[in-house]
């Protein structure tokens, strides 16, 4: 379904840990860079808060080192050609951002799989001793 509608690349830049994603998409309807940026900003401040950061500053790759975000959306670089061909750029620290997501994943798994695991370790309680 997405064949021929999505193209992009990731580029290693000359910093120890920072990379960028160059994403080009063919939109279903016309959009302006401002509309795309507004949509990303809304999500970055909403359900993707802490994962995606919306950035309007003109920064360079080293500025994103040690960022805890999975992606830093570079709003000034958003471009649209003929209304439907959109290009967006996002930066990421491929070690620190990834590590933060792993910590969140492990925390989630621990809470879902064994919500009282830490309590078991600290207090030595067995499953039958837990109260709802």
Where are these predicted regions, by residue range?
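NAD(P)-dependent Rossmann-like dehydrogenase/reductase catalytic/cofactor-binding core
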Residues: 68-132
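C-terminal substrate-binding/catalytic lobe of Rossmann-fold NAD(P)-dependent oxidoreductases
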Residues: 1-86
